């Protein structure tokens, strides 16, 4: 049967969803799921009628062949019987005449059983012949049946291919279902035989049928493998069946959950908490202008924005369970007692803060300070004449030391604002007022330098009114005391005002128990190692205590007061220098005494790790922001700087001040900073990053100096901060792109035109303004409109070449590469001047 005939016989509606399977492969386990056939009723009846007619024709043919075979066997059996009878007659004995009459009855009796035996033998032979005939017939019919079955299978396969092509052409999905299990195929075949009404085969043909079935199985497995490869290689036209896909339904809407976010989190962790793919977060952050990767650490604020953008509720959490467990194991339940006030002296630079404190302490600190200005935060405690103790913190007044002043205000009880009577309110005075208000500390104003002729204390009171600092004279609660730090005038009144203010505040603290405080200043001593100035706020700090201080920890090996004397313990409001920490802590860190050194180390390492993660997240964010800004603005010049200073506070102040110097064109980048002398590592880093090295009150060691000389590194030492900032500004100025300006130096009017064989058109001109110089750039103006811009090629006065022609004189001007000069034109001569730029 040809393909065209098969196609013509194809029913109008044919569903080939005959076998549907879902295979779950896990090791060697295979699960088969079968579905019933879906064939149109009319098609099924037609197929059944054809099959029935075919079977009846085959049955009639088999019966006819069996009848012919039986007749032939009967004929052969009859011939054999006659031959046997003839043989018996020939061997009979001779008959005796006397006995011939008596013989018939006896012989008849004897002959009867013999005849029965012959008949039985004939029947047995006939049965055997019929069985043999049927066996031969079935042997002949079996190959024919197999051929018919194969032909029918081939026709069905072609029908399926035609139907599949039509289905694909119509744009419908085709389910391609195959079995991989031998048992499933055998069961499917049995079901087909039962549903189609096939007769059971004879016993003699079972073995061959099974063999044929095994061969069919083998062929089908090979076909399945080929089809599987086609599907894998995307060669198959049909789509993968829906039954082979995962059987779960996609959620209609996204699930909104409560997302707990720590201080830092990776993109993958955030996606896991929100039960979405990481690519969704990356897409969301790209829309927000952030480029991230799946393993990138992002800070808490960014993660919160992303989660809220995706519709989730955010719960922010600080991951400090370890710290809390360490802090809980502290003895702080002792009775509170009255403590000394901590007083911070603040004010504008050069208003006499340190000199005032020197007079109170009977010391001369100001005389030894570089440039006469304070650049470190100092902590001192003094006793008044009536036996009461006051702790003083002296903060720098320079603008660069904002963080130091803020730190001093945070650790203080009372702020003494020093204002010069001759200068009045200055920028750092205003800043000090803001710090005091932010810290919630009451103010006592000391109007200094009243011994000067131009001093005007009342003007200071008037100026401070606009900053909400109202004196008691005007009905406020701020005490104003007129003092002279140089002559000692009003110092006792100032101390009395401080004591009075502290009594109003009723300051108390726990004296017994484990100490806690704040780091005022820290530095690295070459002989003693890391040194931290700690202001004890509660408890008693003893020698040998284990101190957890920011990222550092350690056992207190030694303690000294502000005068350098060794002490064994320090109570509340006492500033002490502590030795024995693992590193230099940051100024402003909280210092806490804990019981277990191992736990203190764990907390310190945990804090360092979290800080690195946060810093990395911020740096990555800054890099991406810089990348986007550079894409839009172009390249920005960078000045790399390495800062080394004597104390942590100075490092912070310098780095902050340098960052504020950055402009849109030049950016100051601090590539390294630290406390202590300049080492070989610092010099190597400077060489690698092409950076300027800045040493503030520190020097380079011998190995560092060798590297600096070999690599020609720019190293600069400073002891005054404003000198450092001024020189960095000068270096930045040198990196600015030069600015050029055009200055008109002369103007000539064309009176006549001459032709020259060498120079072409020569303009006879009269200089009306300034000076005309040869080889300068010029512009040709016609009716006050620039028509050409070029260069002055030749300049002559009569027949002589001249370098310049002054105002009121005639000259001949040749314009380079331009011959269209006309009478009445103006020739404007200018020069380009470079203008110095500054920051």
Curated annotation (Swiss-Prot):
One of its GO terms (cellular component) is cytosol. Residues 1-21, 57-244 are annotated as: Disordered. Residues 347-354 are annotated as: G1. GTP binds at residues 347-354, 394-398, 448-451. Residues 338-508 form the tr-type G domain. It comes from the Bacteria. Keywords: Cytoplasm, GTP-binding, Initiation factor, Nucleotide-binding, Protein biosynthesis. Pfam families: EF-G_D2 (PF22042), GTP_EFTU (PF00009), GTP_EFTU_D2 (PF03144), IF-2 (PF11987), IF2_N (PF04760). Residues 68-90 have a biased composition (Low complexity). InterPro entries: EF-G-like_DII, EFTu-like_2, IF2_II, IF2_N, P-loop_NTPase, Small_GTP-bd, T_Tr_GTP-bd_dom, TF_IF2_bacterial-like. Residues 394-397 are annotated as: G3. Coiled coil: none annotated. GO terms for molecular function: GTP binding; GTPase activity; guanosine tetraphosphate binding; translation initiation factor activity. Residues 448-451 are annotated as: G4. Residues 484-486 are annotated as: G5. It is found in: Cytoplasm. Residues 372-376 are annotated as: G2. One of the essential components for the initiation of protein synthesis. Protects formylmethionyl-tRNA from spontaneous hydrolysis and promotes its binding to the 30S ribosomal subunits. Also involved in the hydrolysis of GTP during the formation of the 70S ribosomal complex. NCBIfam families: IF-2 (TIGR00487), small_GTP (TIGR00231). Belongs to the TRAFAC class translation factor GTPase superfamily. Classic translation factor GTPase family. IF-2 subfamily. This is Translation initiation factor IF-2. It comes from Haemophilus ducreyi (strain 35000HP / ATCC 700724). The lineage of its organism: Bacteria, Pseudomonadati, Pseudomonadota, Gammaproteobacteria, Pasteurellales. The gene is infB.
